[in-house]
Amino acid sequence: MKSFIKTSLIYFFIFELIFQFLIFFNFKFIKIPDLFYNGYCDQKYWNFNEREILFNSETEYHPILSYVKKDLAVPKSLKDSFLIEDNNFESNKISLYGSSYLNHKEFKLLINNNENLNYKNYALNSYGLDQIFLSYKLTAHLNQNRTIIFGFLLEDLDRSIFYNRDYEKVLIKNENSEFIITNTPVNIEKKNSSSFDFYLIKFLSNFKNLIKNDFDPRLDKCHISKKEDLLNYYINEILKTSSKFNQKLVFITFNLKEDLIKKPTWRYETTKKLLKNSSIIHVDSYALLKNKSQSNLDEINTYFGDDKHNNKKSFEYIIDDLFRKL
């Protein structure tokens, strides 16, 4: 028995040294974050990640949101808000807040077909739900008496627990039941630095969790309480702010194709229940597309593009449902 333990420890030490050597000298075939970490759970996944997102010339630096669209003049401070004493609601004016789904070229082309509506679109690729929420808080006073549409992938919630993903970003922390905005002003020039780790242990632990979660890292319920607390905070703050500025709220939730093929993750029921309890209009793309497809796999495959986002066909269904509910 002692001999077995000794031999095991020696092999463990050897394999760990091999991992350390390969990673230190940046061998690409082994320096893959998915081998060691879960991108929905571990900050080290993103510290380990060498991928960078490239924005076009239409975006610029922002000290809280990291990046914003240049043409929208987003205030740089949450203290810049003011209230106009005018409750004349303008039903033809809409402001959009979200991530890559509401900023998708197919979505924008379709929604702009309605010439009777006037749009402002604050959505930006890569935004987490925290950045979506803060983009609204920063500009809510500029969009009084309007319909406000939030649209996000359910997994955008997970981005809220990280201070860095494809770039350095804001982090909202819950400290003694008070939510604090940290890591601002954001330093987008800051580079990720991989800290030391025991990679063999991380590899084995990650592999075990992948088996447990049917090789879908989204199914892991890591930090679920923190994520649910943040979601509740966002919704409650949005409700208070929208009431102050006489705004009508609509939420569109998007799902990955895997949710339609198998079943949605815990995020779906959590978000759906919270929106229902808050009496918020909800365009539920999962329920809509599930019903349209009648769970037919071939039909489901026609709803998504090569970029894993919805395509023109499914965006049309979603936008039709949106306009029915406005």
Where are these regions (language model features)?
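Loop/turn elements at helix/coil->beta-strand transitions in domains of secreted/extracellular proteins
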Residues: 117, 144-148, 243-249, 278-280
